[in-house]
Curated annotation (Swiss-Prot):
It catalyses: 5-amino-1-(5-phospho-beta-D-ribosyl)imidazole + S-adenosyl-L-methionine = 4-amino-2-methyl-5-(phosphooxymethyl)pyrimidine + CO + 5'-deoxyadenosine + formate + L-methionine + 3 H(+). Binds 1 [4Fe-4S] cluster per subunit. The cluster is coordinated with 3 cysteines and an exchangeable S-adenosyl-L-methionine. One of its GO terms (biological process) is thiamine biosynthetic process. Catalyzes the synthesis of the hydroxymethylpyrimidine phosphate (HMP-P) moiety of thiamine from aminoimidazole ribotide (AIR) in a radical S-adenosyl-L-methionine (SAM)-dependent reaction. Substrate binds at N235, M264, Y293, H329, S349, R350, G351, D390, G391, M392, R393, E429, Y456. This is Phosphomethylpyrimidine synthase. The gene is thiC. It comes from Shewanella sediminis (strain HAW-EB3). Homodimer. Gene3D superfamilies: 6.10.250.620, Radical SAM ThiC family, central domain (3.20.20.540). Zn(2+) binds at H433, H497. Keywords: 4Fe-4S, Iron, Iron-sulfur, Lyase, Metal-binding, S-adenosyl-L-methionine, Thiamine biosynthesis, Zinc. It holds the Pfam family ThiC-associated.
Length: 652
């Protein structure tokens, strides 16, 4: 096990030597929009050819076109990009912001705390090297994407998103790949294809948000909404007892490689301000925070000493650094706190417990609720989106869907309408720990009381019996609520409830939640979702092993598992599944039946039902005879080519 010193040194080495890295057999390609500076990066996965006839020495091959998929890694997956974490990423969105002519550059930071940090020369060794002066809306101007959408303006960001969400759907012409189940969307209105105008309409309606602070021009436009691809958030951040700036930057880059659509910096330790600056300047995805965490640090962890003035200064500090969305626990009202007294696990939200303690100690209403309009005014000046925190979320399935949880949700529904008055983009946070039978009630109630504002949930976790495996227990609930209409899922790692996640934990959590999000997209009938499934299934049936790995969410692990038992080069082109060997692979048998039918010149699906049935029965009888002749063993040791076996889907 690495020591803290070794872990930090490894992270430092990682960022010092950071170079763009692409997944196997993939390349970075760009789709260009209506103007040259709208260049949408995609991951293009190349596939091998399929043998459709001939012999091994003279094969007849059919090409399988490359597949474009969503890529969250930004420049980190582009071999032509120049990466220097001390300079940050290219500010490619800066011109879009400037040409709107509704912002101005500030002479100095507005936050008193920021000014103190900049004046402290003792922090120079921690400071990001290339700081710029922040921007803010001009007097009387609103600079949010919601404001533009309501004015009927289709921004470059909206066009970028439409291209990104479509994933070059129009290029896919193979019916084997475009086939999909009808889907059950539970009232969602998914467009096919997704147009820039559709993006504008959804944002204007409040059903979707584009979290892009004007001070984070490095971020690539993305959208969070029920009628778009389900997104996944990854949490990183230091704590009072572990981690460093180097490690958090490493986790950021690592998170985007494995599909984080947004990243929340939940730092609670030393140097929160400096850590966040490094993260934002090097992030191609939107960054969220929970500002109350840093505000609490400013009063030495004493919740009772928090004030609106300290919190407001923290909002200014973070908005001018470029934070794209704030989690604000404004729905934790004084009268709701007693409702948690009979709970099995009380209040488990950190932000919720901080505000509950403040309310009780002062016997006053939550100052975040009282000053919510002030918060909205501030956010509108920087286009910071609001994520209304669920401070009363249940921390155990025993407390699910109780009075405290749903009372707060009603208040969040009131607050979202206030935020919309200020053209502030808003999403609603949700639970938590919910058994499967109560999940849909959560989604339905949120849609009703929050007027379809996007829902963003932590899981939900469906059972409480598996510490160390809560990415599984919550991934189940995440897939369900994604199907029902949740717009973004906050990942859970294997370390949930146990400790701060490391790099491998982050990857495990992300892969689990990308599966959940994708399963939700498929079930809803999203037009692009099933194409990748079909491409991988086709590769699996044709025994194109490398394509199977590369089309998957985690090519590295798939390849490693295969090579663990079948390391030989011959196994990588073997035309049988390795669980049952070459004699009893179900997919190989299916192929042989097809070949037999073709040899008999029977055209399946067009000939008579009798002939089709006859050929099928004849083929099965032949395989039955072979099975019995070889000992009638269910599993069979294969010959000299391959000695071991690999799992594939089989019936029974």
């Amino acid at each position: 096990m690495s020591t803290r010193r070794e872990t930090r040194a490894q992270a430092q080495q990682f960022i010092d030597n950071l170079k763009p890295l692409q997944h196997p057999n993939s390349e970075k390609v760009y789709l260009v929009g209506s103007r040259d500076d709208i260049r949408v990066g995609m991951r293009q996965i190349h596939q091998s050819e399929t043998m459709i006839g001939g012999t091994e020495s003279h094969p007849v091959l059919e090409s399988n076109p490359p597949l474009k998929v969503y890529d969250c890694a930004g420049p980190y997956s582009d071999p032509n990009a120049k990466i220097n974490v001390r300079e940050g990423l290219d500010k490619f969105r800066a011109n879009w912001i400037l040409e709107r002519n509704d912002t101005e550059q500030l002479i100095a930071a507005s936050s008193g705390f920021t000014q103190q940090r900049l004046a402290d020369y003792g922090l120079d060794h921690l400071r990001f090297d290339s700081l710029l002066s922040p921007r803010k809306a001009k007097q009387g101007q609103c600079v949010t994407q919601l404001h533009y959408a309501r004015q009927g303006i289709v921004t470059p960001e909206m066009e970028y998103i439409a291209i990104r969400e479509n994933m070059a759907l129009s290029e896919v012409t193979d019916e084997a790949l475009t086939q999909k189940a009808e889907g059950e969307s539970f009232g969602a209105a998914i467009s096919q294809p997704i147009t820039p105008e559709f993006v504008r309409q959804e944002v204007a309606r409040g059903r979707a948000i584009i979290p892009l602070n004007i001070n984070h021009p490095e971020a690539e436009p993305m959208i969070i909404g029920r009628n778009f691809l389900v997104k996944v958030n990854a949490n990183i951040g230091n704590s009072a007892v572990t981690s460093s700036i180097e490690e958090e930057v490493e986790k950021l880059v690592w998170s985007t490689r494995w599909g984080a659509d947004t990243v929340m910096d939940l730092s609670t330790g030393r140097y929160i301000h400096e850590t966040r600056e490094w993260i934002i300047r090097n992030s191609p995805v939107p960054i969220g925070t929970v500002p109350i965490y840093q505000a609490l640090e400013k009063v030495n962890g004493v919740a009772e000493d928090l004030t609106w003035e300290i919190f407001r200064d923290t909002l200014l500090e973070q908005a001018e650094q470029g934070v794209d969305y704030f989690t604000i626990h404004a729905g934790v009202l004084l009268r709701y706190v007693p409702m948690t007294a009979k709970r099995l696990t009380g209040i488990v939200s950190r932000g919720g417990s901080i505000m509950a303690k403040w309310c009780l100690s002062h016997h006053l209403e939550n100052f975040l609720y009282e000053h919510f309009r002030d918060i909205c005014e501030l956010c509108a000046a920087y286009d910071v989106s609001l994520s209304l925190g669920d401070g009363m979320r249940p921390g155990s399935i025993a407390d699910a869907n109780d009075e405290a949880q749903f009372s707060e949700l009603e208040t969040l529904g009131e607050l979202v309408k206030i935020a919309w008055e200020y053209d502030v983009q808003t999403i609603i946070e949700g639970p938590g720990h919910i058994p499967m039978n109560l999940i849909k009630e959560n989604m339905d109630k949120q849609l009703e009381v929050c007027d379809e504002a996007p829902f963003y949930t932590l899981g939900p976790q469906t059972t409480d019996i598996a510490p160390g495996y809560d990415h599984f227990t919550s991934g189940i609930g995440a897939a369900m609520i994604a199907w029902y209409g949740c717009a973004m899922l906050c990942y859970v790692t294997p370390k949930e409830h146990l400790g701060l996640p490391n790099k491998e934990d982050v990857k495990q959590g992300l892969i689990t939640y990308k599966i959940a999000a994708h399963a939700g997209d498929v079930a809803k009938g999203h037009p692009t979702a099933q194409i990748r499934d079909n491409a991988l299934s086709k590769a699996r049936f044709e025994f194109r092993w490398e394509d199977q790995y590369n089309l998957g969410l985690d090519p590295d692990t798939a390849r490693a598992y295969h090579d663990e038992s079948l390391p030989q080069e011959s196994a990588k082109v073997a035309h049988f599944c390795s669980m049952c060997g070459p004699k009893f692979c179900s997919m190989k048998i299916s192929q042989e039946v097809r070949e037999y039918a073709a040899a008999q010149e029977v055209k399946l699906h067009t000939d008579t039902e009798f002939k089709a049935k006859s050929v099928k029965e004849s083929g099965m009888a032949q395989m039955s005879a072979e099975f019995k002749a070889k000992g009638a063993a269910l599993y069979h040791e294969s010959g000299a080519l391959v000695e071991d076996v690999e799992l594939v889907e089989t019936e029974g």
